[in-house]
Amino acid sequence: MAYTKIIVIRGRLDKCLSYVENEEKTYLETAVDYALDRDKTERVCFETALNCGRDTAYEDMAQTARRWGKEGRVRKGYHVIQSFRPGEVTPEQAHAIGVELARRALGGRYEVVVATHLDRAHLHNHVVFNAVSFMDGKMYRDSFRDYYEGIRGISDALCREKGLSVIEPGEDAAPS
């Protein structure tokens, strides 16, 4: 079972919105740094960068936005969290599923960092990706339909392929 959620990474909003913002989850650079936090991943093999350098991911993403004239856009990137039921997957399996989710959902068009964190009872992936395609400068679409048919649908399909449980509509989903 993989529980997924997606968070839009935006630039700083007005101070009146600061209450609802969590800077650790909304700034692109901080999200990349958080995903690659060595204290949470324990081993380098649980970090993968797609279409960018692992150590230069933020710089690569910012350069893509500049190259396509999109650096002033509100949406900087996205942070997907994919959490698994405790004991259902190994760290290697969780990471492989996260990388495959990124490949299938984003079609090789965006810079992506996938990091599997082992710091909780439930293993979870952080998939942080640029809102701007490095291939053509197009922005990632982020409607509810795109989420349910795209990211969540692909995550569910991967879980089914691996023989893992899948959250059905209406079930209590969040892992403890």
Description of each model-found segment:
Residues M1-S176:
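N-terminal nicking endonuclease/strand-transfer module with a His-rich metal-binding environment
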